[in-house]
């Protein structure tokens, strides 16, 4: 039952439908007594009813009833930086992968690989507390702030861990993330990663909260330094070299070109965004500081920066897409989030904040959701999804401005809360009537089709009508 609820939470409706169908009424009642959310039971029976209402086309597979077994679902195998990966889902370099036991559990759970927490020869001393969250009403946090830096382990210990991981999990991709303070340190750490058996090395040019200047995002903001350090590491090792980019810049074009000209095999993007929160929970002995912001809230920013590389005519002219692969990072929580990065050209995705919230177990729904989506579309290879939406990203000047789409209200789903009315009155075009029957009505002569009402509706009662020419 818990697995069914989790599948629904992470938008894997195929698995949720299958598992809820297997539950008896007695099991549902027992589950509702046992499952408590804050101070009240989870309404599992109601959740099950809603899930089973979902209408979907039969999955393309060999079964007569249209239902795929795990073995019949499409493979998620994909080539990334000349590494064959069993799926595109990797752990991002962070607190979720700081020792052997953690990474081993993740790999056994189904993750295809890991970008291990950044290794350095420097003395790392972390602060306490070092995490904070941005919340929205009753939701889990949508934004996450952290003040962590790099691995606190002795660097020799970390490379021993990576060696053990590769020995014990030879089919998984083990990637060392490193940060040096000098040219010599960058080269030494990269060589140690190669000697440990790592499949690739990531260069951390992007940590936004380093105690010392001239490290992390200070490098990532300077294309000359990116070119300098990447070139030296590229010449020192034979394994793929993957610089990790900072979002704390105006454009990704120059940093990406620097990586390309230095001979990088790929790029990881993005790291966290510089931020400040003012809550008491973020204080360290009464003081606050600038640090990294991540989570669901940063996904649109991450996607924009991915597009600045994969959809950039300057980079295309240089031939960058033929020589460098992109690993997408930033706000990935469900398989749909991952799909968006893949459709913009990523061949690999990394997850951190969602794992910190929900655990390594989310990999089940990341993989199953993406596989079922591919099966429904009849897609047999993940690489066919890579970059397929790039053609639909255009300049603002190229958008259709002569037609509009009215919102469409389903009164059977409307609960009469008035949220749409308030938002339209105070933030829109006063195009909704809200009478004594507490049922909203669209005023066509005033509506401009902005769809603010649809976005604030708590029940999904407002949909989309057909696109029509704008009224004159």
Each model region followed by its residue ranges:
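Iron-sulfur cluster-binding cysteine motifs and their immediate structural context
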Residues: 1-10, 29-51, 341, 419-437, ...
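Hydrophobic faces of well-ordered beta-strands that scaffold small-molecule active sites
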Residues: 87-93, 114-117, 174-178, 201-203, ...
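Extended, intrinsically disordered, low-complexity segments
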Residues: 138-141, 295, 299, 304, ...
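Short, basic, low-complexity termini and linkers enriched in Ser/Thr/Gly/Pro
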Residues: 45-71, 318, 469-472
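Alpha/beta enzyme core
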Residues: 104-109, 181-327, 335-340, 344-348, ...
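C-terminal helical cap(s) of enzyme catalytic domains, especially alpha/beta-barrels
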Residues: 126-140, 278-291, 343, 354-379
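Ferredoxin-like iron-sulfur electron-transfer modules
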Residues: 14-37, 397-416, 430-449, 462-472
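N-terminal capping/small domains of soluble enzymes
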Residues: 70-174, 180-181
């Amino acid at each position: 039952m818990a697995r069914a609820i989790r599948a629904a939470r992470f938008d894997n409706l195929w698995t949720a439908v299958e598992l809820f169908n297997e539950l008896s009424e007695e099991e549902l009642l027992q589950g509702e007594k046992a499952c408590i959310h804050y101070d009240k039971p989870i309404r599992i029976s109601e959740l099950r009813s809603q899930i089973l209402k979902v209408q979907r086309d039969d999955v393309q597979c060999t079964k007569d009833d249209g239902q795929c077994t795990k073995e019949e679902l499409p493979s998620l195998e994909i080539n990334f930086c000349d590494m064959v990966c069993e799926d595109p889902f990797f752990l991002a370099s962070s607190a979720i992968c700081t020792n052997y036991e953690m990474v081993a559990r993740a790999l056994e759970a189904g993750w295809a690989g890991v970008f291990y927490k950044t290794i350095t020869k420097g003395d790392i001393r972390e602060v306490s507390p070092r995490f904070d969250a941005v919340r929205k009403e009753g939701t889990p946090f949508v934004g996450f702030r952290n003040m962590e830096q790099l691995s606190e382990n002795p660097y020799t210990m970390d490379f021993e861990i990576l060696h053990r991981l590769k020995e014990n999990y030879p089919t998984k991709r083990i990637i060392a993330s490193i940060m040096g303070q000098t040219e010599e340190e960058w080269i030494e750490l990269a060589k140690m990663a190669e000697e440990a058996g790592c499949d690739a090395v990531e260069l951390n040019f992007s940590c936004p909260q380093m105690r010392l200047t001239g490290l992390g995002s200070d490098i990532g903001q300077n294309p000359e330094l990116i070119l300098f350090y990447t070139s030296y590491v590229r010449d020192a090792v034979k394994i793929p070299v993957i610089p990790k980019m900072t979002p704390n810049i105006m454009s990704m074009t120059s940093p990406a070109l620097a990586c390309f000209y230095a001979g990088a095999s790929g790029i990881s993007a993005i790291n966290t965004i510089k931020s400040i929160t003012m809550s008491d929970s973020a204080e360290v002995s009464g003081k606050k500081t600038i640090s990294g912001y991540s989570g669901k809230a940063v996904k649109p920013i991450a996607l924009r920066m991915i597009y600045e590389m994969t959809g950039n005519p300057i980079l295309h002219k240089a031939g960058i897409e033929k020589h460098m692969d992109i690993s997408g990072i930033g706000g990935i929580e469900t398989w749909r989030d991952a799909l968006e990065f893949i459709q913009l050209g990523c061949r690999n995705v990394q997850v951190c904040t969602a794992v910190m919230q929900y655990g390594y177990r989310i990999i089940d729904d990341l993989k199953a959701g993406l596989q079922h989506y591919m099966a429904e579309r009849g897609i047999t290879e993940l690489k066919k999804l890579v970059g397929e939406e790039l053609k639909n990203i255009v300049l603002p000047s190229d958008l259709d401005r002569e037609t509009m789409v009215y919102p469409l209200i389903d009164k059977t789903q409307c609960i009469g809360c008035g949220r749409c009315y308030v938002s339209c009155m105070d933030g829109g075009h006063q195009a909704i009537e809200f009478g004594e029957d507490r049922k909203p009505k669209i005023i066509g002569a005033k509506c401009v089709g902005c769809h603010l009402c649809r976005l604030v509706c708590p029940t999904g009662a407002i949909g989309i009508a057909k696109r029509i020419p704008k009224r004159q």
